[in-house]
Amino acid sequence: LLGDDEKYKIKGIVDRIDHDGKGNWEIHDYKTGKRALSQKAADKDHQLALYQIGLMSEVENIKSVKLVWHFIQHGIKVESKRTNEDIRKVINETKNSIDEIRGKLSNGGEFPPKKSILCNWCYYWEECPTQYGSNPYIQS
């Protein structure tokens, strides 16, 4: 949930979460694409920040959360952290995006799915109108 509002639910799959038992957490994401994020881009990226929001809603007594991207092809790691203000901003921006999409759909606008190579890494084939059955590229 984004905040306490039931109408803003997000579903995602985290690659890895670590903790030291003392309230310090790390959220890891493994990227296989050609391009690595710059530090500036990582500091603005929403994906792992949304995972952090999910973690914060499920776990008490969190002291710190480090966001870590592993770029496999380049052998590099990029780390970032979010302040409470950053988290509030991500929540608000994400809610606004959801509201925009809902508004467009309720006014007869379309939001057509687009098939691409990225579909091979998607866990939502069974819910997608462009795919059939479960994703054969992903093992459960």
Language-model segment annotations:
Residues 1-140:
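RecB-family 4Fe-4S metal-dependent nuclease core
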